[in-house]
Amino acid sequence: MASLLQSERVLYLVQGEKKVRAPLSQLYFCRYCSELRSLECVSHEVDSHYCPSCLENMPSAEAKLKKNRCANCFDCPGCMHTLSTRATSISTQLPDDPAKTAVKKAYYLACGFCRWTSRDVGMADKSVASGGWQEPDHPHTQRMNKLIEYYQQLAQKEKVERDRKKLARRRNYMPLAFSQHTIHVVDKYGLGTRLQRPRAGTTITALAGLSLKEGEDQKEIKIEPAQAVDEVEPLPEDYYTRPVNLTEVTTLQQRLLQPDFQPICASQLYPRHKHLLIKRSLRCRQCEHNLSKPEFNPTSIKFKIQLVAVNYIPEVRIMSIPNLRYMKESQVLLTLTNPVENLTHVTLLECEEGDPDDTNSTAKVSVPPTELVLAGKDAAAEYDELAEPQDFPDDPDVVAFRKANKVGVFIKVTPQREEGDVTVCFKLKHDFKNLAAPIRPVEEADPGAEVSWLTQHVELSLGPLLP
């Protein structure tokens, strides 16, 4: 159960850009590099944006335009659950005959958890079920939009200036055909894209983005600097004396969810558009191969590529821990699980003295010197009690039990510290048959070339010492 409910008890070391210790269930395995990968040593790529409520899929440009929020779904400002649309019947007077009334349907937003409704803040009911809901206007919207446009233009000017300085340093290496006059014409009139050749790396490619004409045509945006105010608006006279009704005061979380308004009273809470979620792909930074790629459809939970480490690396679990005492040898039972369908040979090795990875060990560990053979994974054999087990020459002092692709192994632990938790480290050496190896001719193929030996650094947290 240590890998399911207490995954932090068994950690694997990832030798990436920086060393990361994480449970095997949170790691990936690159079949091309034959190394473990964590979320900190992979590239994250956004595949699609979608709404978790209505499952509407939208491209990245549209999601950016909508500020990564769904236009039709709302979150409750009180409890942050999804709001549902409720229908009700209202009586309205006919325009032709005011004495007569007609029944029409009206729609409003309601929360099924905290009973908040859009009528609580005075939002008018709508005649259609989706869209057209009233949203509060922010007084500083125009100011913020103008500031964004100003800084976007400023960033564009700085980028052009940086590219121009790079070009000036490379002008000494220009071909003779591109004289100073040619460079000036291309730079001034934006002819770089027309003269650009399909061959990458040419000097015209560097000139393509240095168009001054676009910057000259754009009207320079000017903003007014903010003016400091000497006097602030005074507080109301009854601010300190009037009684406070806590049911009408918003919580800190409710205010932080609406940073543009930060409502103080519950009557100022307006529904917020639901945030979009993303489906992302993970790519190895060394070989550029995908480690995880989900299906594009938001309703699908399947993956096109999912190279999780638990499907390729033998998994270590803690089965039983005896009473651990200072400088007394104890026997710990571990289970090794083979996740692949072929036989896997495993050898447990002690960490060498001065190993830079062995920094958290607080106990001396003694592992079995013999090589262990793990049977291949067979889903049908796990539920077949009458199936004959494979015969392996196991040492009863080393192997406690064997069932399907699992093996129970004894290790001996001697705590070296008088207090604190007991942590042991060892190396797990196993063979791996790489099915993603490049295809070669039959005469050049080596039967043992695809099998490689990998070594994993494993740390076990065995709990506190007993007095």
Swiss-Prot record:
Residues with PTM N-acetylalanine: A2
Pfam family, one: Dynactin_p62
Signal peptide per UniProt: none
InterPro entries: DCTN4
Protein location: Cytoplasm, Cytoskeleton; Cytoplasm, Cytoskeleton, Microtubule organizing center, Centrosome; Cytoplasm, Cytoskeleton, Stress fiber; Cytoplasm, Cell cortex
Residues found modified as Phosphothreonine: T414
Keyword Cytoplasm: yes
Keywords from the UniProt entry: Acetylation, Coiled coil, Cytoplasm, Cytoskeleton, Isopeptide bond, Phosphoprotein, Ubl conjugation
Record location of the Glycyl lysine isopeptide (Lys-Gly) (interchain with G-Cter in SUMO2) cross-link: K222
Main location: cytoplasm
One Gene Ontology CC term in the entry: centrosome
Highest taxon, organism lineage: Eukaryota
Keyword Cytoplasm (UniProt): yes
Subunit note: Subunit of dynactin, a multiprotein complex part of a tripartite complex with dynein and a adapter, such as BICDL1, BICD2 or HOOK3. The dynactin complex is built around ACTR1A/ACTB filament and consists of an actin-related filament composed of a shoulder domain, a pointed end and a barbed end. Its length is defined by its flexible shoulder domain. The soulder is composed of 2 DCTN1 subunits, 4 DCTN2 and 2 DCTN3. The 4 DCNT2 (via N-terminus) bind the ACTR1A filament and act as molecular rulers to determine the length. The pointed end is important for binding dynein-dynactin cargo adapters.
Functional summary from the UniProt entry: Part of the dynactin complex that activates the molecular motor dynein for ultra-processive transport along microtubules. Together with dynein is involved in spindle assembly and cytokinesis.
Homology family: Belongs to the dynactin subunit 4 family.
Name recorded for this polypeptide: Dynactin subunit 4
Protein source organism: Sus scrofa
Highest classification ranks of the organism: Eukaryota, Metazoa, Chordata, Craniata, Vertebrata
Gene, per the UniProt record: DCTN4
